[in-house]
């Protein structure tokens, strides 16, 4: 095997199934081919290294579904924890009325932003929001690709630190691949101090790029790191 090949390993119940990415093949397709005998869908464990690590989990099923108003009490509870609050502070103190005003139109399909709930075996563990960056012209000027799909996310504190983050993003990405088949890039811009979020993105296949100053709703400015995912290379 040549040194310029991308190597894949799929972890499955103590076994390591190894392979390489063929020319023109995505990392996801290579992982599925490598573990074809397992008859299960691989998800990323860590795509940030030279060897792209995937895992097959036979016990935890991770999915994303559309958010409903019935999810708002959970979202309110999550948003009030220090774990999430510091990174969403610009939106103000979370209240039931505030969340209804912000998320209600998104739930109803009246906003370019859509809301999703991440679940593990049917239990809600966090939320994701996405949007076509071009629908927000001020933000589009800051990003590298105005046609990219932007994404923000938060995991409940009690579910953090379990390696779920990359798999949450993967579940969202595989769904988004069908919703926006023409999109070539997914884009996230976490605060430069949010090391956990940056690591989560890297493990899911994103590449960190330029730092830039992003104006916030409360008039402050945060320095964020633009992170992009090449859809064709990672997902196919």
Regions inferred by a protein language model and the residue ranges of each:
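The catalytic Nudix box helix
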Residues: 16-44
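Acyl-donor (CoA/ACP) binding surface of acyl/acetyltransferases
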Residues: 27-29, 36-38, 49-60, 66-72, ...
């Amino acid at each position: 095997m040549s040194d310029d090949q991308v190597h894949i390993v799929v972890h499955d119940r103590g076994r390591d199934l190894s392979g390489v990415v063929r020319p023109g093949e995505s990392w996801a397709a290579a992982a599925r081919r490598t573990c074809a005998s397992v008859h299960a869908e691989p998800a990323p464990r860590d795509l940030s290294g030279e060897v792209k690590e995937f895992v097959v989990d036979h016990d935890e099923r991770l999915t994303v579904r559309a958010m409903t108003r019935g999810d708002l009490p959970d979202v309110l509870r999550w948003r009030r924890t220090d774990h999430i609050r510091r990174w969403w502070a610009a939106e103000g103190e979370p209240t039931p009325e505030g969340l209804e005003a912000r998320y209600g139109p998104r739930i109803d399909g009246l906003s370019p932003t859509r809301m999703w709930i991440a679940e593990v075996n049917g239990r809600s563990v966090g939320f994701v929001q996405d949007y076509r960056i071009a629908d927000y012209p001020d933000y589009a000027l800051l990003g590298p690709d105005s046609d990219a799909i932007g994404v923000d996310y938060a995991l409940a504190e009690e579910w953090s630190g379990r390696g779920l983050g990359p798999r949450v993003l993967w579940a969202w990405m595989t769904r988004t691949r069908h919703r926006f088949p023409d999109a070539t890039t997914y884009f996230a811009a976490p605060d430069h101090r949010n090391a956990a979020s940056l690591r989560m993105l890297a493990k899911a296949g994103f590449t960190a790029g330029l730092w830039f100053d992003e104006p916030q709703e409360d008039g402050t400015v945060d320095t964020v790191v633009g992170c992009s995912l090449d859809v064709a290379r990672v997902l196919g």
